[in-house]
């Protein structure tokens, strides 16, 4: 199978495609990384930097920015309502998918991911620059309300899925799922009081969806993982979660764009909300 076999092949572009569109005024290349300082060491020519924490999250309440703030972020980066935004970043595009998902919360649907992310671009010896682009501010319409309902899940939604047996997938590492650790093995074990998983959740680590070079696996391989291995189907109401929502946004992208599932929501509160919540039920082990 080729990339064209994905449900929405237009949402995933190659490094070659990006290289050919670096100067396309209708396209804005957006870098979003876990390491927020990485952009300054070198980035794709013309790419803007969107900091997942400083630019997309409310700085007081645990939530996202409001529609007016989102419009301001887009405006200062030369992004209009019809601009094609191509996201890429480190960590096999965790944070690129996260940023794309947040853009979708505000109704910006013309979005794509660069397959393989930053690492693939660098491995191919493609150009990087430290020069920061300057784009003229553009007018971006302000939504009356952020569109959370379609693709975002909250504690109550995850709890309902847990109690009713609806599909709930935990995309963290197996050790996190079993409750042996509260973060990935190579990270500080902090930020959450209890380890384990939401009762009824299935463990499907995000990493099963990518190849060693960070590119996405074929549709046939993904179908084996999610449709056959987890008994998921495009018509089911699915909630995915991780620790803070970034890894589960990667899985959300896979299910939504590559497999064409219609009802997938990302529970961005994830384990740092569930594992810290008083009396929230917790399961451990496999």
Predicted regions, residues:
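Thiolate-centered catalytic microenvironments shared by cysteine-dependent enzyme domains
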Residues: 2-7, 64-164, 180-181, 196, ...
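Positively charged, proline/Ser/Thr-rich regional signature most characteristic
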Residues: 3-82, 157-230, 234-235
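Terminal peptide-recognition signature
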Residues: 18, 47, 103, 121, ...
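Short, charged, surface-exposed secondary-structure boundary motifs
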Residues: 56-62, 121-124, 140, 213-214, ...
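Short low-complexity, flexible loop/linker segments enriched in glycine and/or proline
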Residues: 126-129, 184-185, 279-281
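Extended hydrophobic/aromatic segments used for targeting, binding, or gating
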Residues: 262-286
